[in-house]
């Protein structure tokens, strides 16, 4: 079965069990000839230089940080870069915070992105497992920020094992990675701001690669806010005239 057909079947099963409204929009689209070759870039060259040749590794990557740390921005950029490389991406919004306008501004192709809004973490993990088991995505992003408990820990580790077997990558957005075994852990924090004149147009973000409690490496990246930057540049030009 081709990847597009597998994706369609997997999403149909999800809708049959949880209801049509659980999937908001989009579909999985990819070139099956690219399976196993898709580069899951972070969208930031400095960070990619620290990662494996294909970017996010097979299995589970934990993307953790406080609200406003840039973790969602990094996930969106990774989704956009993976789509641009021909990969299939799915997004499971267990925290119910997905912003389509922000995603589009970060380059995500919303018409090619299934967005699943599960009722709870158990439904989120079961849905994620169905997508991975169907070999229907190169990259699956699971936003479970704010969710805690043993069900999350056990479910993430089972999901990671499935992803390794199928050659897929799972990126989980979490507040805390305590107790979860992962293939990679990235910790995000905002360490400064980017300005044009007096306008804030982005942030300076630190991404640390961690192995257990130890910090292995870190990189500083600049993240522009597209709309703020455009408005600030326009204001600067008007002021100069």
Could you tell me what each predicted segment is?
Residues 1-91, 238-241:
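Detector for small/aliphatic-rich hydrophobic stretches
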Residues 3-6, 10, 39, 43, ...:
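Helical mechanochemical/support elements of P-loop NTPase systems and associated helical scaffolds
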Residues 51-55, 83, 129-136, 164:
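Signal for well-folded cores of large energy- and translation-related assemblies
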Residues 78, 128, 159:
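Aromatic/hydrophobic pocket-lining residues that form π-stacking "cages" and hydrophobic walls in ligand
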Residues 81, 102, 162:
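Hydrophobic/aromatic ligand-binding patch that stacks against planar heteroaromatic rings
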Residues 86-154:
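Conserved inter-motif catalytic segment of the P-loop NTP-binding fold
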Residues 145-182:
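Long, charge-dense, solvent-exposed interaction surfaces that engage phosphate-rich ligands
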Residues 168-241:
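Phosphate-binding/switch region of NTP-binding enzymes
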